[in-house]
Amino acid sequence: MDSKHQCVKLNDGHFMPVLGFGTYAPAEVPKNKALEATKLAIEAGFRHIDSAHLYNNEEYVGLAIRSKIADGTVKREDIFYTSKLWCNSHRPEFVRPALERSLKNLQLDYVDLYLIHFPVSLKPGEELIPKDENGKLLFDTVDLCATWEAMEKCKDAGLAKSIGVSNFNRRQLEMILNKPGLKYKPVCNQVECHPYLNQRKLLDFCKSKDIVLVAFSALGSHREKPWVDQNSPVLLEDPVLCALAKKHKRTPALIALRYQLQRGVVVLAKSYNEQRIRENMKVFEFQLTSEDMKAIDGLDRNIRYLTLDIFAGPPNYPFSDEY
């Protein structure tokens, strides 16, 4: 297998490419930009594409995938595509319809991976972020074990090859793993993970359960105004990463991506810039030494860019626990 398409074997037997292309973009970026960027990513060698119903771009991402299949660049089975169940569809009866809606937008027959996007449940309906007249979120109370059973049915129906979770803490993972009658374990937990929040304890726990940790915001953050503290430090300007970049004649972004691959984390790289999309594929062309890895480990300072404070309150808010 050529280095570009290195994969990790999931606990259900399917394979996931260790480098993924993230398609989320801030609200002000036109959605059709996802079409061009995803095509460029596939042309550059990305085979793992990550999106979600929340991102409002699945019709464009699907169009990009289908156009690259149509022109012979890839076959459908070469692509590993991830979608995610949004919080307003946690009730078991809404899970399959939500996935079917994503598939309709994508014009695909199945997704390779379907994730519970975030463990806090929101009021069902068309509104992605339902709020009351005071601007407070409208929550729902759903047993995530029931949501998981509906996810398992989506796998059995062939609509999703694999199923997993995102933004779950250890307690929430254990709740699923210890569920009576569990049919399929989550194959992965996709979480914010980068040198400033290296998730060591969660990573060790996931490894012990044969669950893959997938890193989003691996390059720091998109720093989108409503969501991210504008005073938080910029990861890619970190002096240690910059020094290592100089040493290896690479970019700080490549150092941050390579760090994750060497600790057994699947990493998502998001860029809509053609040069950087191509650049990020070079992560397989070099290695960090154990000293380099130790230096990056030393950067961990528990900085979470995406705290999603508006979701705080319900017991399922995941970021109150240590990990």
UniProtKB/Swiss-Prot annotation:
Catalytic reaction list: a 3alpha-hydroxysteroid + NADP(+) = a 3-oxosteroid + NADPH + H(+); a 3alpha-hydroxysteroid + NAD(+) = a 3-oxosteroid + NADH + H(+); (17R,20S)-17,20-dihydroxypregn-4-en-3-one + NADP(+) = 17alpha-hydroxyprogesterone + NADPH + H(+); (17R,20S)-17,20-dihydroxypregn-4-en-3-one + NAD(+) = 17alpha-hydroxyprogesterone + NADH + H(+)
Transmembrane segments: none
Function: Cytosolic aldo-keto reductase that catalyzes the NADH and NADPH-dependent reduction of ketosteroids to hydroxysteroids. Most probably acts as a reductase in vivo since the oxidase activity measured in vitro is inhibited by physiological concentrations of NADPH. Displays a broad positional specificity acting on positions 3, 17 and 20 of steroids and regulates the metabolism of hormones like estrogens and androgens. May also reduce conjugated steroids such as 5alpha-dihydrotestosterone sulfate. Displays affinity for bile acids.
Site description Important for substrate specificity, residues in chain: L54
One GO BP annotation of this record: digestion
EC number: 1.1.1.-, 1.1.1.112, 1.1.1.209, 1.1.1.210
Enzyme class label: oxidoreductase
InterPro entries in the record: AKR, AKR1C, Aldo/ket_reductase_CS, NADP_OxRdtase_dom, NADP_OxRdtase_dom_sf
Keyword Cytoplasm: yes
Domain of life of the native organism: Eukaryota
Name by which UniProt lists this protein: Aldo-keto reductase family 1 member C1
Species, as recorded: Macaca fascicularis
Gene3D superfamilies: NADP-dependent oxidoreductase domain
Molecular-function annotations in GO: 17-alpha,20-alpha-dihydroxypregn-4-en-3-one dehydrogenase [NAD(P)+] activity; 3-beta-hydroxy-5-beta-steroid dehydrogenase (NADP+) activity; 5-alpha-androstane-3-beta,17-beta-diol dehydrogenase (NADP+) activity; androstan-3-alpha,17-beta-diol dehydrogenase (NAD+) activity; androsterone dehydrogenase (B-specific) activity; bile acid binding; carboxylic acid binding; estradiol 17-beta-dehydrogenase [NAD(P)+] activity
Leader sequence segment: none
Activity control, per UniProt: Potently inhibited by benzbromarone and 3',3'',5',5''-tetrabromophenolphthalein (TBPP).
Keywords carried by this UniProt record: Cytoplasm, Lipid metabolism, NADP, Oxidoreductase
PROSITE patterns: ALDOKETO_REDUCTASE_1 (PS00798), ALDOKETO_REDUCTASE_2 (PS00062), ALDOKETO_REDUCTASE_3 (PS00063)
Positions bound to substrate: Y24, H117, H222, W227
Subcellular localization(s) per the UniProt record: Cytoplasm, Cytosol
Pfam family of the protein (one): Aldo_ket_red
Subunit structure: Monomer.
Binding site for NADP(+): 20-24, 50, 166-167, 190, 216-222, 270-280
Site (Lowers pKa of active site Tyr): K84
